[in-house]
Amino acid sequence: MDKKQLVRLAQDGSQAAFEELVTKYQSKVFSMAMSFIRNREAADDAAQEVFLKAYLALPKFHLRSEFGTWLYRIAINHIKDVLRKRGRAREVSLDDVRELSIVDENALEKADAERETEARKGLVLSCVQRLPEKYRVILTLRDIQGLPYDEISQVLHMSPGTVDSRLHRARRMLRTKLASHLGQEGGSHEM
């Protein structure tokens, strides 16, 4: 069954059809929330609230655009609200800390490599979070969520040219922030 059929069934009150739509989009919505909110529990709550808002607004959805595009628009607006309510306080989860059960040379090397990878990811996410919102949103949708330009254009209600130029600026700003941060640490890191 295609997405349009699922949407129509959900609009007609089919709980199973809506649950299937949730299943199809749950990981993408959660991932989007997580990339902005950076706290697993808060991102999970936000994702659930996005689906609740979508469910309540479903009768107003007219299938003129893709369901995913409509849902991402709801998600972006809700995530902005969550961040405004939190006062943009950044939360960093320490769930990445793992204990080694067997201490040997290979395990230590692997743990060091994982920590380095996590540190790099954390640095990139931290720099992304410091970008102005209009650039952070586009960078997240394209480079983290992997949405195509035309879908980003629809979600954000802007021309593909504007999406392209803002994405270019966002990437340049991110490179500058990363270079500045790495320069402060001695510049010996490779990204």
Which residues make up each language-model segment?
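Structural recognition of an alpha-helix C-terminal capping motif at a helix-to-coil junction
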Residues: 45-52, 65-77
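N-terminal module of bacterial RNA polymerase sigma factors
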Residues: 1-28, 35, 129, 151, ...
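Internal acidic/polar
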Residues: 3, 89-114, 148
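DNA-recognition helix of helix-turn-helix
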Residues: 76, 80, 135, 144, ...
